[in-house]
């Protein structure tokens, strides 16, 4: 039995050091050298202060800001520690109630808007942390944001177009708008007026 104990203990120690110390340290160094922004969370800074991450959505509910997708990480919205597949099933009455509540909130915030409400404005993403919305969801909100900020609709529309990312490699994913980056750009325009 002793003859098996030493090699087993040595293997545990060696592989613990390799996989628990050396490999993570090597990956961290490579990430910091090759992709420092992404390795540190893709943080967005404005005036020397961190405003958030381009990878995790934030709660915006003021009329002068674009609103993102619903967060499924209750009770604290966009809590990365609570991320999970927490969407209701399609037959769950709670889903219909949540969607109707969001529709009512969107209509109350912009009663004159006759555009169809995009589905991503009334449903949560699988993770509940989605930082992006569709261009249709951004376009739906242009009039409300422009009116709340006293800006021309065309100016806000142009900002949405500037912040629309196209499909990756031309075929992967869908066009999308990062809500935090768009709202930061709005704040910069407003501060110039």
Curated annotation (Swiss-Prot):
GO molecular function: ATP binding; P-type potassium transmembrane transporter activity
Keywords, alphabetical: ATP-binding, Cell membrane, Ion transport, Membrane, Nucleotide-binding, Potassium, Potassium transport, Transmembrane, Transmembrane helix, Transport
Membrane topology note: Single-pass membrane protein
Residues passing through the membrane, by range: 10-30
InterPro entries in alphabetical order: KdpC
Protein biosynthesis as UniProt keyword: no
Annotated S-S bridges: none
Pfam family, one: KdpC
Leader peptide range in chain numbering: none
Similarity-based family: Belongs to the KdpC family.
Function: Part of the high-affinity ATP-driven potassium transport (or Kdp) system, which catalyzes the hydrolysis of ATP coupled with the electrogenic transport of potassium into the cytoplasm. This subunit acts as a catalytic chaperone that increases the ATP-binding affinity of the ATP-hydrolyzing subunit KdpB by the formation of a transient KdpB/KdpC/ATP ternary complex.
Subunit-structure text: The system is composed of three essential subunits: KdpA, KdpB and KdpC.
NCBIfam families the UniProt entry points to: kdpC (TIGR00681), PRK00315.1 (NF001454)
Protein's name according to its UniProt entry: Potassium-transporting ATPase KdpC subunit
Taxon lineage: Bacteria, Bacillati, Chloroflexota, Chloroflexia, Herpetosiphonales
